[in-house]
């Protein structure tokens, strides 16, 4: 599950951009892949209600801001329509990681790892690691599209998501998340990532 950034331009203008090319690659890799609007599916609405309840109202953006891969489909939030080409591209890079995790683990195993090790709330190591693998790709894609400074600027938001209610306080250890983040930035710096 990834939260949307802001956006405008090419996704709205109808120009074929990098996110469309990435979608083509994803559809080749995952032939049954589809993008669906979350609000159109009762299960997604039920998940939104359940998350709002178990997080004591802390996660109220599930339908409006967060996108979710479930059963090989990408369920997009209301924000998808307003995202520009770069935002969609970065999001799709993140979500493709989840599609690959699903293929590697299978639906049941991935759901169990996501929900239970160690606890469903507060210390969810399985969810933290699944999401971290995808957030590495978010950071890398951001650096590719917008430069290292933009990638560095993601730190506080990603830490907030890990230690806060968005993902059920999945890893409430900000120093650990900052260390993980720093490791990714260091690897990008070592690669000499050019500015866009």
Please identify what each model-predicted range represents:
Residues 2-74:
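Auxiliary, metal-adjacent structural segments of Zn-dependent hydrolase domains
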Residues 12, 19, 23-29, 112-196:
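Metalloprotease/metallohydrolase-associated module, dominated by Zn2+-dependent proteases
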Residues 40-43, 81-82, 97, 106, ...:
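Short, solvent-exposed loop/turn segments at secondary-structure junctions
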Residues 48-56, 110-120:
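Short hydrophobic helices that act as membrane-entry/anchoring signals
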Residues 64, 71, 86-90, 115-118, ...:
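Alpha-helical hydrophobic/aromatic positions enriched in membrane-embedded helices and signal peptides
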Residues 74-92:
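Short pre-active-site segment immediately N-terminal to the catalytic Zn-binding motif
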Residues 79, 95-114:
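Catalytic Zn2+-binding segment of zinc metalloproteases
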